[in-house]
């Protein structure tokens, strides 16, 4: 039997997690024939995800039913599929239908997105505010990797879905003297836009994978698996136009949290950079979006060049939003998301998958630049996975895989 049938994708792993730790954890479920942590081909730094191959493929069923924590970090596990299998699934219409068929299922989450955070807010203050709604299991404030400046947004995880419902009784909260916006964070497979139409590769559609164009999954907590819930069904470009491989923790390419125009301008990111800023009233073009045009002032009294619901919100203004994360001050969470955007626009760069142009998986679709026959244009990039032959199982919730090929931007 082909050993690749027992292949598991593991995302959101700590930078400190190596192959030995990966193998040690999953050996509890069965014999591990191979464990791989993907690394940046230029810097050698871990990319925050990897793969495990079990000798007995039947082990995967049990692994996928449980939650996993390695080096105190909750990781995301999905069945890996070959490109051929992915394409067959796409042709037969089985792309995540059980997970994106509508109804209330996609609203069920224990995580929220919080935008417009004060720049001086600490993790502890962040946690204390939301603990009044229920026990908090994790918090993360996003930072710019290059400057260590807070990006103005973060995530809070509760131990119950009811706590999220309580928080969302109002959209705006007063936190440390500043009004912040709260939204439900959803797994990218939960597509409120309806069905599998939004999951194709390329264009501006699909919940397509974590990733950016260069460094990769350097986010420090599992919130990199989530994106904001929104009611617009147009495109939802999602976690990465460039695949899982790069979106976490590379430079600031001006993209970020959203293809919706995002919370920031076109070149800086959430509160960082000359043309962006999540409410920097003295910055022209700041606010929610990067697309041009006059927009109403946002909740932070910021002249937004695009604005929530204005041009760019849910449209092709994919390269904007919350930019990059990165190292954080010692007292705060070092987590962060990709240089190209987390969520609506996706964690991802504009031109590659695992740092290339095909990447790990446009569901049944082709990558935007280069195909699977181009060297380094697909797959897991490095370590024998550069042939673009594998993707994540869409039925496991990755929507279009880890790459959108150019749509989204998407994490």
UniProtKB/Swiss-Prot annotation:
Entry keyword annotation includes Transport: yes
Domain RRM as annotated: residue spans: 6-82, 110-187
Top-level division of the source organism's lineage: Eukaryota
SUPFAM superfamilies in UniProt: RNA-binding domain, RBD (SSF54928)
Region (Nuclear targeting sequence (M9)): 341-390
A GO BP annotation: regulation of response to salt stress
Function: Involved with pre-mRNA processing. Forms complexes (ribonucleosomes) with at least 20 other different hnRNP and heterogeneous nuclear RNA in the nucleus. Involved in the packaging of pre-mRNA into hnRNP particles, transport of poly(A) mRNA from the nucleus to the cytoplasm and may modulate splice site selection.
Protein name: Heterogeneous nuclear ribonucleoprotein 1
The species this protein was found in: Arabidopsis thaliana
